[in-house]
Amino acid sequence: MKKFTTLLATAAVLVGFASCTKKEKETGKTLNIAVSAEIKGMDPIYANDRYSSNEVGRVYEGLLEYHYLKRPYTLVPNLAESMPSVSEDGLTYTFKIRQGVLFHDSEAFPNGKGRELVAEDFVYSIKRLADPKLQGLGWWLLDGKIKGLNEWREKYADLDKVDYDEVVEGLKATGKYTLEFKLTKPFPQFLYSLAMPFTFATAREVVEKYGKEFLNHPVGTGPFVLPVFKQTKKVVYTKNPNFRKKLYPTEASDEFKAAGFLEDAGKQLPLVDKVVVSVIIESQPRWLNFLKGNVDYIGIPKDNFDSAVTPERELSKEYKDKGISLMITPSLDVTYTAFNHDLKLFQNPDLRRAMSLAYDVKKSNELFYNNTSLPAQSVVPPGIAGNIPNYVSPYRGPNIEEAKKLLAKAGYPEGKGLPEITYDCPSGTVSRQIGDYMKQQMAQIGVRIKVVTNPWPELQKKITKRQVMLYGIAWGADYPDAENFLQLLYGPNKAPGANGSGYDNPEFNKLFKTASVMQDSPERTALYEKMNRIAAEQAPWIYGVHRQNFTLRHSFLKNYMSTDFETGQAQYLNIDTELKAKVTKKL
């Protein structure tokens, strides 16, 4: 999932050593959020999708985070006291851990009271990510990057028990509050990995107490507390009464200053007492709940777009009169349909190209995205170095005549001899419609598709275990670098890593490996562009679109903006309770 900047950025998010007191009065402020997929659990090492990442980010924290009000996106300290000191050779990173930070209260601790966070907690948490028995879904992020960590992982691959106390050369707590990383090579994106949920701090006592049930007993250091997670349609978080002193930013980029985002400057976080997350899979019930004031913000469903947004891309008067605001922001993402390259069938590039040419992405943009998205020519979205402006993929459909020729060249004239292909997608009306559209498009050239819908956690599991043939999905940036998109096609990242399709091209892999250790430069961008062209010409996916976010928010919701990095956002949001009472009376 998402973006980056300089190593020595300074934080305008003010963080001190004191914590909130339990005597602090509740304000009655509740943030109401609706999500469109089931939440699979609350274990950071499995938070590989937008939904679980956002939930994990309410409870857990990492060394670094993105400054909430600065663009370009800028890394700043979070549980780290400051940005790290970095050796001249770019291999050793030394962090000072913020003192006085407490884990949430839990039965796993003596007397049920949360203990202080120390550097060793990060050593343990990152070893969990590397643990071969656990198969953490974010291992691709650190694979081959920390000295001795791969060897530690390989040593225990065939043993019954993993020794977390064994010292790893490149991952050490050199003092109670001092954490040291030694890298195998310089990796420019390394710091971004420390702002991702995969590397967030967990307490060993809690993991060992709950074992396999740990994902249902989240205990972090974050702004909100959730004693027990249950697979229900509603999850309720409460303000962490022992949260450290962390204040709303006092600095912002000009666009946010002008929009009034500094009204809460200097206030203690979080600004609300509760966060209620409702799982509402279908778009129309989500929409109706938003209109009733039961949900504070929402992406506009496709079926309601024309009533909410004018042809000039402005909010219609009906909604303006209700105090609703419209935000339009480009998203660093790509939607796509992936082939399972483990199957011999899809190792045939002409079959992949034929299916790509049969797919009318322009029409799908009209049908499912209200013609607001940009058809994707390859994997890297606009706004990131490595995207090639004005580039047109040679296999961007629709071109039915050429698709039929390539299908015949692949050995399946008019689809003869080709087995029925299963297309897996998430549950929900729109996802099903997209699946049916795929079926109809492929039928034009004689390719038979069977659509199978899955609850989101089940689809994730099937992709991870490579139990799919063809599947529809989207990827949102973890950080703002083309490497984060190109790694989706890097062979060594095959599932359970981020490369769910299992695409493995030696030339692409070689270029990726070279670029991954290069600093930002024209030379690195040239390699990114070369990989982007390979990704278009080899058609490892059927490319969809780069989306644009059209988000509505109620006037009583403060400090909200659509962002590529939502993890931790809830702590900055505020509710004007008096205004909410007035507004909801009229809804």
Feature names for model-found ranges:
Residues 26, 185-188, 218-219, 230-235, ...:
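Detector for C-terminal structural segments
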Residues 35-88, 219:
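N-terminal lobe/hinge region of extracytoplasmic solute-binding protein
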Residues 37-55, 79, 107-111, 137-138, ...:
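A structural "hinge/loop" feature
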Residues 68-70, 150-178, 182-276, 284-285, ...:
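Gly/Pro-rich hinge or "lid" segments in bacterial periplasmic/extracellular proteins
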Residues 224, 346, 374-410, 427-433:
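Structural transition elements
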Residues 227-238, 263-264, 276-342, 366:
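Extracellular/periplasmic solute-recognition and catalytic clefts
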